[in-house]
Amino acid sequence: MINKNNVLLQAEEMIKPLVLEHVPQDSDVEAVIDQWLHAIATDSQFYCNPKISKSEQLKERVISLLKKNGLYTTRSAFFNDVFGALKLKPELDANFRFIDLFAGIGGVRLGFQQNGGVCVFSSEFDKHAQQTYKNNHGEIPFGDITKIPANEIPDHDVLLAGFPCQPFSHAGLKLGIEDTRGTLFHDIANILETKKPKFALLENVKGLISHDKGYTLKVILKTLTEMGYSCNIPKHVIEHGSTKEIQTLAKEMVLKSVDFGIPQNRQRIYIVLWRAGEVKSFEYPKPLGIEVKVGDVLEENPEPKLTISDRLWEGHQRRKIENKKNGKGFGFGLVTEASPYTNTISARYYKDGSEVLIDQAGKNPRKISPREAARLQGFPDEFEPSASKVQAYKQFGNSVTVNVIDVLAKKIRDILDGIN
């Protein structure tokens, strides 16, 4: 938990009455309070309802109030008051600004923050993930993104989103963004159309490529190219090519965690989009060629209770044999310290029978610890997992591999530096 200093506590109480009329449906008051204080500290735009106030005028009013009460002297000092207790903090003077949608516990945020970016708005529906996000990033994310008007979101250079895979209507790809109505992707597209950031990074499971026989991916890309965005698949292919051709070209967007210094066989699709006319192209990162092994992420003295019981171990082995016979997959993945990688860690770790198990000489294998799950996703040891082990496994399983985000963020940052 964060130990807030007196200035931060007083500032929160002081601005709360002003915040209340700007809180969107299904979001906490604390989310707007945090966003305002962070916006002052990082010189970013306020989230606000434009029907009530203009963002810059509201920000000036709040800063004036804080100054009058001795809570604000300089931005640098206020930055230290706001972020001083955080182990993972942004830079005082950011190179670019981004928003973090479907944020989870902030894995995507970390990758961009450590490359000089600052988060100006975050959104996450799950209350447990929100709390972990707060403990590490100092802010409660806004809630249901479908209840937040796009024009109220602060200006940003990069939109980041890891969204669920949902099918679209087969009405005929005739209505553009309206073809996506009723899906969470529609809200992402609406924000892109309204705010027009220079870049967007959309992360999803590799299965998005084959989802609904490639139709889902085609709708996503066609919708965004019609809004003025480009990706590594040519526009004429997206508009007139077959779904098979799009699927083939989309394979370049799939990156493996093990190729970027993390011993986990996790594959995800990372759709990088840029504003046509502002950015010429984007080259996906190549594997780093770093040799890794599972032992790199293991703790020296794991808790004895991580070792699984005889009954559980026998059940795992029996189900693995049965699954293999029935062609249902092979269940758990048993690895040693010398193994080059684990299988993919999932949000249902230790519930679906496909978990990572660590071999132990002379005794039953063991589960990985929450800290090891964090390391398998590239989270630094300074990151504070949920106090609930069930939630910690779920949150890391649902997250991204920070190392992969880091290399993508570096490339996007370099292009933005060239533009700016």
Regions found by a protein language model. Name each.
Residues 64-218, 222-225:
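Core alpha/beta nucleotide-donor-binding catalytic domains of modification enzymes
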Residues 105, 217, 268, 398-406:
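Short alpha-helical patches at coil-to-helix transitions and adjacent helical residues
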Residues 1-89, 311-420:
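C-terminal target-recognition/interaction regions appended to catalytic cores
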Residues 118, 230, 291, 380-382:
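Short coil/loop linkers at secondary-structure junctions
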Residues 148-158, 168-344, 348-350:
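Class I S-adenosyl-L-methionine
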